[in-house]
Amino acid sequence: MTKPITVQPGVQLRDADKMALIPVKFLPEQEGEQLKKPDWMRIRLPKTDEKIQNVKNIMRKNNLHSVCEEASCPNLSECFNHGTATFMILGAICTRHCPFCDVAHGKPLAPDADEPKKLANTIREMALKYVVITSVDRDDLRDGGAQHFADCIREIRLASPNTRIETLTPDFRGRMDKALDVFRETPPDVFNHNLETAPRLYSMARPGADYAWSLKLLQKMKELHPDLPTKSGLMMGLGETNDEIVQVLKDLRAHGVTMLTLGQYLQPSRHHLPVKRYVPPQEFDELKAIALDLGFTHAACGPFVRSSYHADLQAQGQEVK
């Protein structure tokens, strides 16, 4: 009989331990069962890792986290080599346990009250002109962590007034009104919240989340700040159909979203949701054309695209794929 998983405060649960807590069960893949990666999914590594190590050292020195490392992003080498990173606030332990995500699950510790200042000082030290701030889900906090986001935005603007700030937030489920009240006074320059996948796959891929709730959050933020660009992202390769993706795009536009990212899902380990298929680059191009026809002003679509991948270029409307 399998020993029950005990969740202790501050302890990170990953892979099999994390998946054991998910209500929708699936068997981990065995060796040889994974789909073979096509040639277009091969990553070119930089010739030297000096810049990569420099970014990591700065993060360690200030006791900060990057979603690039915590979520095992395939673009880590490229982004760190360019001196950029997506900062993950509110700790490295998520209260959700989505089976596509490599971020650790568990009972997080109290937020670090000094994190906003440390984050702002780090961004100033790195001389960043565009930053993306994301977080784990914090269902244990009364406002879902919204005030911590606002504190970070405020400190960054004090330290680096010319730096543009994009926030990639959780859904603040059950706490939307409190979160919106916080963002009313301290909005970012771009507000991003990912739908991740088609609603049919939510019970499997996003347990604890709600498709309509996420759409409402995006809509409410746009209503509060009509000139604020709102953004959302989707993964492909989880078993969705292209027709389902197009319907999600229509739903996003109906809720005022103007910026879009579409990328290929990659399985972090054999314990995570398997890749159902690798979507060829030409399909991403076709979906981008549909997105632009639907009225999206920005659409970054390609196998390696992630929400924060070259987010500064995305915001400028440049080609990212």
Swiss-Prot record:
Catalytic reaction equation(s): [[Fe-S] cluster scaffold protein carrying a second [4Fe-4S](2+) cluster] + N(6)-octanoyl-L-lysyl-[protein] + 2 oxidized [2Fe-2S]-[ferredoxin] + 2 S-adenosyl-L-methionine + 4 H(+) = [[Fe-S] cluster scaffold protein] + N(6)-[(R)-dihydrolipoyl]-L-lysyl-[protein] + 4 Fe(3+) + 2 hydrogen sulfide + 2 5'-deoxyadenosine + 2 L-methionine + 2 reduced [2Fe-2S]-[ferredoxin]
SUPFAM superfamilies with a match to the protein in the record: Radical SAM enzymes
Keywords of the record: 4Fe-4S, Cytoplasm, Iron, Iron-sulfur, Metal-binding, S-adenosyl-L-methionine, Transferase
Binding site for [4Fe-4S] cluster 1: C68, C73, C79, S308
Residues binding [4Fe-4S] cluster 2: C94, C98, C101
Domain (Radical SAM core): residue spans on this chain: 80-297
GO cellular component term, pick one: cytoplasm
Localization per record: Cytoplasm
Entries under CDD domains matching the protein: Radical_SAM
EC numbers, comma separated: 2.8.1.8
Cofactor: [4Fe-4S] cluster
Pathway participation: Protein modification; protein lipoylation via endogenous pathway; protein N(6)-(lipoyl)lysine from octanoyl-[acyl-carrier-protein]: step 2/2
EC category name: transferase
Domain of life (superkingdom): Bacteria
Chief place of localization: cytoplasm
Note describing how the cofactor binds: Binds 2 [4Fe-4S] clusters per subunit. One cluster is coordinated with 3 cysteines and an exchangeable S-adenosyl-L-methionine.
PROSITE patterns associated with the record: RADICAL_SAM (PS51918)
HAMAP family noted in UniProt: Lipoyl_synth
Family affiliation: Belongs to the radical SAM superfamily. Lipoyl synthase family.
Protein name per UniProt: Lipoyl synthase
Gene behind this protein: lipA
